[in-house]
Curated annotation (Swiss-Prot):
It is found in: Cytoplasm. Its EC number is 4.2.1.49. The keyword Lyase applies. One of its GO terms (molecular function) is urocanate hydratase activity. NCBIfam families: hutU, PRK05414.1. Its cofactor is NAD(+). The gene is hutU. This is Urocanate hydratase. GO terms for cellular component: cytoplasm. Keywords: Cytoplasm, Histidine metabolism, Lyase, NAD. Binds 1 NAD(+) per subunit. It catalyses: 4-imidazolone-5-propanoate = trans-urocanate + H2O. It comes from Caldanaerobacter subterraneus subsp. tengcongensis (strain DSM 15242 / JCM 11007 / NBRC 100824 / MB4). It comes from the Bacteria. Pathway: Amino-acid degradation; L-histidine degradation into L-glutamate; N-formimidoyl-L-glutamate from L-histidine: step 2/3.
Length: 549
């Protein structure tokens, strides 16, 4: 019988204060069956992104937090608690490093070897940093991306447009909801029937289809009628996409959210059933990887052909282009990345994914904070539309949570307002405030967030390290540095931060420092690279940059 983990609710503490209770509840929330993709194996999302290295390490993390003093800091090395040291009350209670490798050895083969020896763990982005909130965590970012695409190409709406993608895991599961929120009709291909069923249960997906003809019939009818509809098709994109090309059916928009970043534990080869693929993964991993990469090449070739025939095609940051390129698809990078196409201008303004979680477990706490963010920022139309749609259509997974994109100044203002609500007793318990690592100044990822930087600094990884150091110095509740999230081992370095709004005056200082410096560094990073929007923002906001002219 598999173990079931669920975060405590209510106001009873299991640790010495809320600054320690917060990571205690959030690591458990990451493994809640409502939240995690494969909780029995400690896998939260993203192929093999884990919350802890093994169950023994998980239990020791909880035990360490239960006994942690208010002026101590727990160190976690790739999902394993390795030390507790006396620091001070304003220091982080937990510091995490996941999957870090010396650059010469930063590749999947070395990582898998070390993982098999029990020495490391893949933390993805928010899996190993204990701030994953289910598919909602990416829905809003996906909504922002498709909204920017719709604004650029289709007068702000996806109405009457056919969007094709694949992957309905923890990340990809956000796609159908985001697309239908913008009135589009979409077909999402997924090999795992259970993942499709899960998205139906959470109301992120409208319909499941077993047959391509059936799926196309529904999607094309919805497109013609200008009706929002999402269809999940049981199938493999490496088979389905080439078949669409053969039939001459070219969608308006094409992207991909399969776990292509991980050719062993993520992407599933075509030409076999899912059960056969899982068996091959265990019996002959080298053959599995070979077949997976071949399938990715076929997948990308079909996307390129659709692009040539007029589809708007973009890469959604899963490194599928690189995998295909390595298999001989030399024009794979003709497909542009979503960040320079649709998101970078937002990063230049210090905007990014801001999330908060009700430690009480009471949805009313989130609804009250929804109202507060609308009161604070009434002139932001995308934010207001998102909050309204999220309240109507996003089902909570695990502890109730919300996400929205906020910029420099907005984050600190809202964070302080939340802390004031806790202090006044308007909320039943403290609120955890965090973000995805996919943010303005916290990641170096040349095939995703930092692709095609203006000054050529795509691979410069000082920025996420500076981000983690700054957030530690600013007094965050916990800080993490990870390797390989989103695009796989060897391709990214990134940092996460969480602060617990416990209602105290001391936490006002934490919040103001963390939620100002964190997005502020993103503006600095982009201004340093020569982006005019970031330079203008830095000057307007009074951000000190010694070498800014």
């Amino acid at each position: 019988m598999s173990r079931v983990v669920r975060a405590p609710r209510g106001t009873e503490l299991h640790c010495k204060n809320w600054q320690i209770e917060a990571p205690y509840r959030m690591i458990m929330n990451n493994l809640d069956p409502e939240v995690a993709e494969d909780p029995a194996n400690l896998i939260v999302y993203g192929g093999a992104g884990k919350a802890a290295r093994n169950w023994e390490a998980f239990d020791k993390i909880l035990e360490s937090l239960e006994n942690l003093e208010e002026d101590e800091t727990l160190l976690v090395q790739s999902g394993k608690p390795v030390g507790i040291f006396k620091t001070h009350e304003m220091a982080p209670r937990v510091l995490i490093s996941n999957a870090m490798l010396v650059p010469k050895w930063a590749n999947w083969e070395t990582f898998w070897d070390l993982e098999a020896k029990g020495l490391t763990m893949y933390g993805q982005m928010t899996a190993g940093s204990w701030i994953y909130i289910g598919s909602q965590g990416i829905v809003e970012g996906t909504f922002e991306t498709f909204a920017a695409l719709a604004k650029k190409h289709f007068d702000g709406s996806l109405k009457g447009k056919f969007v094709l993608s694949a992957g309905l895991g923890g990340m990809g599961g956000a796609q159908p909801l985001a697309i239908t929120m913008l009135d589009g009709a979409c077909l999402i291909v997924e090999v795992d029937r259970n993942r499709i069923k899960r998205r139906l249960e959470t109301k992120y997906l409208d319909v499941m289809a077993e047959d391509l003809d059936e799926a196309l019939g529904m999607v094309m009818k919805a497109k013609e009628e200008g009706r929002a509809l999402s269809v999940g098709l049981v199938g493999n994109a490496a088979d389905v996409h080439p078949e669409l090309v053969r039939r001459g059916i070219i969608p308006d928009v094409v992207t991909d959210q399969t776990s292509a970043h991980d050719p062993l534990n993520g992407y599933v080869p075509n030409g076999m059933t899912l059960d056969e693929a899982i068996a091959l993964r265990k019996s002959n991993p080298e053959e599995y990887i070979k077949r997976a990469k071949k399938a990715m090449a076929e997948h990308v070739l079909a996307m390129l052909e659709m692009q040539k025939r007029g589809a708007i095609v973009f890469d959604y940051g899963n490194n599928i282009r690189r995998m295909a390129y390595d298999e001989g698809v030399k024009d794979a990078f003709n497909i542009p990345s979503y960040v320079p196409e649709y998101i970078r201008d937002l990063f230049c303004e210090g905007k990014g994914p801001f999330r908060w979680v009700a430690l009480s477990g009471d949805p009313e706490d989130i609804y009250k904070t929804d109202q507060k963010v609308l009161e604070l920022f009434p002139d932001d139309p995308i934010l207001n539309r998102w909050i309204r749609l999220a309240r109507e259509r996003v089902k909570f997974q695990g502890l109730p949570a919300r996400i929205c994109w906020l910029g420099y100044g907005q984050r600190a203002e809202f964070g302080l307002a939340i802390n004031e609500m806790v202090r006044k007793g308007e909320l039943k318990a403290p609120i955890v405030i965090g973000r995805d690592h996919h943010d303005t100044g916290s990641v170096a990822s040349p095939y995703r967030e930092t692709e095609a930087m203006k000054d050529g600094s795509d691979a410069i990884a000082d920025w996420p390290i500076l981000n983690a150091l700054l957030n530690t110095a600013s007094g965050a509740t916990w800080v993490s540095v990870h390797h390989g999230g989103g695009v796989g081992i060897g391709y990214s370095i990134h940092a996460g931060v969480v602060v617990c709004a416990d209602g105290t005056k001391e936490t006002d200082l934490r919040i103001e420092r963390v939620l100002t410096g964190d997005p502020g560094l993103g503006i600095v990073r982009h201004a340093d690279a020569g982006y005019e929007i970031a330079i203008k923002t830095a000057k307007e906001k009074g951000i000190k940059m010694p070498m800014l002219k």
